[in-house]
Amino acid sequence: MKMSFRWYGKKDPVTLEEIKAIPGMQGIVTAVYDVPVGQAWPLENILELKKMVEEAGLEITVIESIPVHEDIKQGKPNRDALIENYKTSIRNVGAAGIPVVCYNFMPVFDWTRSDLHHPLPDGSTSLAFLKSDLAGVDPVADDLNLPGWDSSYSKEEMKAIIENYRQNISEEDLWANLEYFIKAILPTAEEAGVKMAIHPDDPPYGIFGLPRIITGQEAVERFLNLYDSEHNGITMCVGSYASDPKNDVLAMTEYALKRNRINFMHTRNVTAGAWGFQETAHLSQAGDIDMNAVVKLLVDYDWQGSLRPDHGRRIWGDQTKTPGYGLYDRALGATYFNGLYEANMRAAGKTPDFGIKAKTVGTKEG
């Protein structure tokens, strides 16, 4: 297992040097952020990003993400041209030696929360989705701009896209469009040596009358059966799935491990109920997920992928503007999961490797 960390490129206030100092940190999860959605990523942009990361003593373990254009999700006539661009991006990621691409097929937005600074009992704040905050709210009728929505669209464009989904695209239509996309890109991913890892809907249930399809166990089974290849896998985001209390994330994790289809791990903890959900500290007791049991499954199945501590609380005066992506709590999460990994590896009679090549600098002989 390679511990990895999300980094938003040169504009990220969290630096590669700070990330490198986290014990056992090996990988960077990032993307090319200066190419518009729908256009192909040039190889030189990817190689420039890779060089920057490697000069800091890290490696890019996952691209998160190559965004899927809304016209592909909606099955519009221009989707084939957009898919060709997507395939070019996959080829170039593979040519750069990066093994995994995380992506999603969520309509309109990547994630939705109603509060970015909801208080927790320990005095910190975190991201929350409170259904009561959104009761009666209509993103088409109201002047609404929630976190996680694609800012590249104007409000009028956003409203038109939402209305098109509501009027013309059912969940089965979205499944059909996803299947079309998967069957088009997976042969390219296989040839390029890139494993694809779809992220679940966040939250994993319907909101605002929009179709949601990557939501739980049955959806994962259906998705994996669309294209039977280890290159067609999932991002097992335990926090996203656990945001719906109906989901048994341990059973889901083991199911996907048995099929060797977890291509990326996100480990955030949440507490959830009929009221919605709130993200918590990573510690098992802080939320609803037995994180030790999750890591034990990864060890039991000799999982070799990349894991990143997903989202963090705002603690210790962290002023990072990107919600959930401050340095401090994610660094705590990384060391926590590395600790769980080492304990479970040693209990299994195995020796963990955190990629540490030197224990000090220079010679110490007199």
Swiss-Prot record:
Its EC number is 4.2.1.8. It catalyses: D-mannonate = 2-dehydro-3-deoxy-D-gluconate + H2O. GO terms for biological process: D-glucuronate catabolic process. Keywords: Iron, Lyase, Manganese. Its cofactor is Fe(2+); Mn(2+). Coiled coil: none annotated. It is an enzyme of class 4 (lyase). Pathway: Carbohydrate metabolism; pentose and glucuronate interconversion. Pfam families: UxuA. It comes from the Bacteria. GO terms for molecular function: ferrous iron binding; manganese ion binding; mannonate dehydratase activity. PANTHER family: MANNONATE DEHYDRATASE (PTHR30387:SF2). HAMAP family: UxuA (MF_00106). Belongs to the mannonate dehydratase family. Catalyzes the dehydration of D-mannonate. This is Mannonate dehydratase.
